Amino acid sequence: MDAHAINERYVGPRCHRLAHVVLPRTFLLHHAIPLEPEIIFSTYTRFSRSPGSSRRLVVCGKRVLPGEENQLASSPSGLALSLPLFSHDGNFHPFDISVLRISCPGSNLSLTVRFLYLSLVVAMGAGRNNARSPTVDGVSPPEGAVAHPLEELQRLARATPDPALTRGPLQVLTGLLRAGSDGDRATHHMALEAPGTVRGESLDPPVSQKGPARTRHRPPPVRLSFNPVNADVPATWRDATNVYSGAPYYVCVYERGGRQEDDWLPIPLSFPEEPVPPPPGLVFMDDLFINTKQCDFVDTLEAACRTQGYTLRQRVPVAIPRDAEIADAVKSHFLEACLVLRGLASEASAWIRAATSPPLGRHACWMDVLGLWESRPHTLGLELRGVNCGGTDGDWLEILKQPDVQKTVSGSLVACVIVTPALEAWLVLPGGFAIKGRYRASKEDLVFIRGRYG
């Protein structure tokens, strides 16, 4: 596949091994990954034995359909790309995580998909051990079968030409299929000469009679050579399952070609003797950390609500009816928003964007739009440029100009969280009601967040 071959050439030398994957349509729909020309795919590895991560590498991703790029009908189709893998002293740690980040420069799109090293390495090893030759529709031609004449010509075109067949009709037809160099053309008639030469005469212009005669030398022809990218068909592919989402995908193994030969070497795995924390804690370390911070934030919201006598203030100036039904609806939205936040463990959240923002963007705010009662998917990590969320009336008027905030205030079944660079956050509910909380993060937490998610 083109994407795998390009990554093998340009990304392969910058990592220890490449895992070539194909993400099918079901995987793309599950993770809401769009297929647009402007999308940028970048990957890096989060190490389980240290809080840091590897350098970020941009990889090539391309959509592949059955029958395209010389693919077989039985080949996997979807989004083809590669995941760089990094080893420790020659061994791969099974609990390291390869992170695929999908972003689009012209929009706020920022998605991350995680792949566990253990799943990738096991699938690569299984594909290597059970490699099979690609066949058409899964059926291999019987031994001794007579090939089609055109297939025989193609085989001869790829083979080294036999001098005995240089003047034969079969070689003439073969030469038409092969892009040969000048002078590598078989002629049917032995008396024909190269074009541009007249028998007995030279086409060189006569030397001028004026002045001393000078010998004219033709400059040597310029030869340009390049190594084209060979888009081979995978020798085999294995099904794999994403540990974090349960969505299936494919891992491709190639038989030959450059560094792809390393796919056939043993893949060393280094399991810790007594991992601390246990393996589930290493695999879901990011989820546990983010979920802990989300629960702490919800605790600050509930504490602020108790301090205010279990009341909510209307921060955004909008007109709404004042009756018991509206009060019950706002209360229900507040309880549902707290439940959603406790279960939201995503590194694309606004508070992580705020914690990892560069110093030049400290005057911006970030927002998460939450779909309550599973009414809509969440939209996380939206940047509100030029907005200051200090809590004053003027700040709320500026915030109200944001389209997503307007939909939240005037709608239902939705809430939003606005986070400042200082990690102060406001939960905004329909009707303009808002309550202030805070994400607790120590200096060590900020170093961990910036090194792992920045």
From Swiss-Prot:
Q: Which UniProt keywords apply?
A: Capsid protein, Host nucleus, Late protein, Viral genome packaging, Viral release from host cell, Virion
Q: Where in the cell is it found?
A: Virion; Host nucleus
One GO term (biological process): chromosome organization
| Family matches, as InterPro entries | UL17-like (IPR007640)
- Which cysteines are cross-linked by disulfides? none
Q: Which cellular component appears as one GO term in the record?
A: host cell nucleus
Region named Disordered: 197-227
This protein's assembly is summarised as: Interacts (via C-terminus) with capsid vertex component 2/CVC2.
Question: Per its database record, what is this protein's job?
Answer: Capsid vertex-specific component that plays a role during viral DNA encapsidation, assuring correct genome cleavage and presumably stabilizing capsids that contain full-length viral genomes.
Q: What protein name applies here?
A: Capsid vertex component 1
Q: Which organism is it from?
A: Human herpesvirus 8 type P (isolate GK18)
